[in-house]
Amino acid sequence: MDLVSDLERIFHPRGVAIIGASNRPGNLGGFFLGGFLQQGYDRDQLYAVHPTEKEVSGVKAYPAMQAIPHNVDLALVFSPCDSVKGVVADCVAKGVKGVIICTSGFAENGGDGIKLQGEIAGIARAGGVRIIGPNCVGVYCPESKLINYAGWMPRESGPVGMFSHSGSMTVSMPVAASIMGIHFSKVISCGNECDLNAADFLEYFGRDPKTGIVIGYVEGIKDGRRFFRIAREVSKNKPILLWKGGTSDIGSRSAASHTGALAVKTQVWDAVCKQAGIIKVDCEDDMLDYLQAFYYLPRPRGNRVAIVSATGGLGVAMADACSDYGLELAALSQSTRNRLQGIVPSIGTCVNNPVDIGMMSSFNLQMGIDTVRALAQDEGVDIIIKTVGTSNLEMVSKEFEALAGFDKPMIYIFSRAMMALLKELKPVKGVAIYSTGRRAVQVMSKMLEYERYRSGK
């Protein structure tokens, strides 16, 4: 079996069967089928399989897989767990290429569930069929209109690939990221991994030309040596942001009951992630913040930061954050300071780094643009962080557009109150937005850590 070809058939199938879909309110298979239709999936390539239904949501239903008179590459299974073994055998007989088992009640329950899951995997393996799951919510590929769970998933494609041991995160993360203008190539809910697992998905994303950033949420790694060997290769070209759940005693017990994951000591996990060039993530906010940086910002060439603020206190606080995270304040050249003296007022300002451009800068668009441009053109500056003192989004948007194209990361700090307005602001390549200067500095430290790994330093 060729891994990439196997997964491509799952992400771009010719014919999808939804087994167990019905018109009964609350039926999960019927809900998924409706989601496919909402995404605009070709209904002529959709087939419901149910012993008594004639059609589901207007899609023709068949009593069994063998009754479908067309080719089916992908089957989604919502049948009761005690019938899934027979369903997978039917899929093998039909010539299905991939099966996504959404049904739960297998290895995560222990005992007989482990045995049944192993038997299902054996049937699929013998028949040359690849399985995602069981106990998962499927896959999401906006390019081919495949959805996991809900028809209101974003329809735009982007360069982010995701695999997750949490089904809900395969929905919440693309939706939250889309508010920032960040979109995904493919998303995979791993489930119990009776066949395809996180290492397979990481390898696939590493070889997928439509994926440039890989993110993941895991509760355990089944084949750790292979996973981290693959990660070392993938991270040379694509950043990997990885969040591990179950790091505490309580969390590890929850992970075991969730997906049957085995515990890994935190110290060991941290060490192997560092060796493999993986950017370790600790929460959803981290994931979205780091993702925004790798999605929008050019890679920093060094750790020298220029800070711009409308008040001296904010600049001092960010300087402290730089010290805490191993970043340096850039020493501005004399020519840059001379330029700044011609840009900012002479009263209540400072042209040394941190640069204090005064409160009136909140009302002067050109002053903000010229200040950042001068710093961006200083060879001694690698990163620019600027606080935003205005609530005028039109003014901020014009500043972003004027500064697009510089090859240095530009980070803007919005107040928490203003962060709620960001969905009204068009994202600009080269600019990232955070709610605190400390948060921005932390994100930059992670980007620099990744660049050091890539350069072998």
Q: How should these model regions be labeled?
A:
Residues M1-K457:
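Catalytic-core regions of core metabolic enzymes
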